[in-house]
Amino acid sequence: MSAQDKLIKPSHLITMDDIIREGNPTLRAVAKEVSLPLCDEDILLGEKMMQFLKHSQDPVMAEKLGLRAGVGLAAPQIDVSKRIIAVLVPNLPDKEGNPPKEAYSWQEVLYNPKIVSHSVQDAALSDGEGCLSVDRVVEGYVVRHARVTVDYYDKEGQQHRIKLKGYNAIVVQHEIDHINGILFYDRINAKNPFETKEELLILD
């Protein structure tokens, strides 16, 4: 039984046990494009990946299943070398602590995503980045594009083009790196992890 066959079984919930860690060669491979129209197995895998992200952000389910919270997951992280990513970016409460009207600012499974253009300006998160496949803290600015335009297919096989900036742009670049065999710390300046160039936009 392949890793994907196991993951898409109706009774299976993706947990941290399914997430492979740095050192596994799948994380360093360039993943293969999925065939269109999408097969049922690839659609199911995308749904399972999104289910994992929702569980990871739900305090009750996360504790029950022992999950670390995530806003994105790429198929190579569950040992399936395919160009599939899921993103689930939650909206935050307002300054008074009131819950947002919409739970998520972005919720999508992207098949064969590709960055087709990007800004000259770079950006990095002030607190750095983490990864479900990296069980350690790696400090430093992860330098990425401040804005990107991404082409992808949804589960219906429809093609989309979206323009992203800020945190959502960072998230999608992190996940697209995964399907290209790149880990976030590859983009940290090894000699000067917190180097700031004049044009670097630091996002809180």
From Swiss-Prot:
The job of this chain, per UniProt, is described as: Removes the formyl group from the N-terminal Met of newly synthesized proteins. Requires at least a dipeptide for an efficient rate of reaction. N-terminal L-methionine is a prerequisite for activity but the enzyme has broad specificity at other positions.
| Keyword line | Hydrolase, Iron, Metal-binding, Protein biosynthesis
Q: Which cofactor does it need?
A: Fe(2+)
Could you tell me the superkingdom of the organism this chain comes from? Bacteria
Q: Quick one: a GO biological-process term for this protein?
A: translation
> According to the UniProt entry, what is the EC number of this protein?
3.5.1.88
> Which Pfam families does the UniProt entry name for this protein?
Pep_deformylase
Q: Return the SUPFAM superfamilies for the record.
A: Peptide deformylase
Give the molecular function GO annotations. metal ion binding; peptide deformylase activity
Q: Name the InterPro entries on file.
A: Peptide_deformylase, Peptide_deformylase_sf
> Family assignment?
Belongs to the polypeptide deformylase family.
Which HAMAP family does the record cross-reference, listed alphabetically? Pep_deformylase
Q: What is this protein called?
A: Peptide deformylase
Which PANTHER family has this protein been placed in? PEPTIDE DEFORMYLASE (PTHR10458), PEPTIDE DEFORMYLASE 2 (PTHR10458:SF8)
Could you tell me what the cofactor note in this record states?
Binds 1 Fe(2+) ion.
Q: Which residues form the active site?
A: 175
Could you say which residues bind Fe cation here?
131, 174, 178
Q: What catalytic reaction does the record list?
A: N-terminal N-formyl-L-methionyl-[peptide] + H2O = N-terminal L-methionyl-[peptide] + formate
